[in-house]
């Protein structure tokens, strides 16, 4: 019902806010994976190269996904 959707929306917004405010994290491995992160200073999804491990949630495989999650 409505109550469940409200709670679900609240938690999604909390997760979304936390992920999108995390700093870009390349990671400690030496891979070379093109990714996008949300830059909270510019308000835009920006490309970066991810090393393959040790990243965080602000790491999206596509620009479209970054924009959808972070509303950029």
Swiss-Prot record:
| An example Gene Ontology molecular-function term | ion channel regulator activity
Thermal dependence of activity, per record? Thermostable. Complete trypsin inhibition at all temperature ranges (25-100 degrees Celsius).
GO cellular component terms given for this protein: extracellular space; nematocyst
Hey, what's the signal peptide range on this chain? 1-14
Keyword terms of this UniProt record: Cleavage on pair of basic residues, Disulfide bond, Ion channel impairing toxin, Nematocyst, Protease inhibitor, Secreted, Serine protease inhibitor, Signal, Toxin
Report the protein's function: Serine protease inhibitor that inhibits trypsin (Ki=50 nM). This protease exhibits a pronounced neuroprotective activity on Alzheimer's disease model. It enhances cell viability by 39.4% when neuroblastoma cells are in presence of the toxin component beta-amyloid, but has no effect when these cells are in presence of 6-OHDA. It induces an effective decrease of reactive oxygen species (ROS) level in the cells treated with oxidative stress inducers. It also protects these cells by inhibiting ATP-induced purinoceptor activation. Its binding affinity to P2RX7 is moderate (Kd=43.3 uM).
The record's misc note reads:
Negative results: does not show activity on the eight potassium channels tested (Kv1.1/KCNA1, Kv1.2/KCNA2, Kv1.3/KCNA3, Kv1.4/KCNA4, Kv1.5/KCNA5, Kv1.6/KCNA8, Shaker IR, and Kv11.1/KCNH2/ERG1). A synonymy between H.magnifica and R.crispa is controversial.
* Family named by the database record: Belongs to the venom Kunitz-type family. Sea anemone type 2 potassium channel toxin subfamily.
Q: What is this protein called?
A: PI-stichotoxin-Hmg3d
Native organism is Heteractis magnifica (Magnificent sea anemone)
